[in-house]
Amino acid sequence: SQTYIRKNSGDYLATPEEISRFMRNASDNIDAELLENYTIDDLDKESILIFKELVNIRRPDENFLEMDPFTFLKKMGVFRIDRTDARKYKLTLAGLIFLGTEEAIASRLPHFHLDFLNKKGNPDRWIDRVSSNDLNYPNLNVLKYYRIVRDKIFATIDDPFELDKDAIRKSKTELQVVLREALVN
């Protein structure tokens, strides 16, 4: 049996990568998958602190900074109760990808790879790169990757002096919002 995909005006044989994507997308709530044999030690401590600070900025009344890491991570859904296994708390796949160490992520998802290339001015060569397994970016998980790449993208935005129709200086903030949303997606 073969799998086909509709592209423009015809049906074409799907590549192995496309089939893999179909299977991934067909899984219900894969991010909430509870992982066996993973603990808080599989998460990057620096990322946990960054995450606590970010959440605390949004919701300062909840005293997240006062919570111990495990209590905080349970409250955020990074660890959830496995109701089929004596109600033990287990790490979610999303929690691993978002806050995990590279070693722990790779042990569960061996093909997981984050990569950002800045090819400004030359499409054949990159001038800046953020990539998994790069010693310049230890324990690169989704949270660290997002923060590093966001800052690098924002640094590339030219901000010339320009006035709008009301003689008010235009800001790069709108472009930053659009770029941030694109990166998140």
Residue positions per predicted region:
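Active-site helix-to-loop segments that bind/position phosphate- or nucleotide-bearing substrates
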Residues: T3-V184
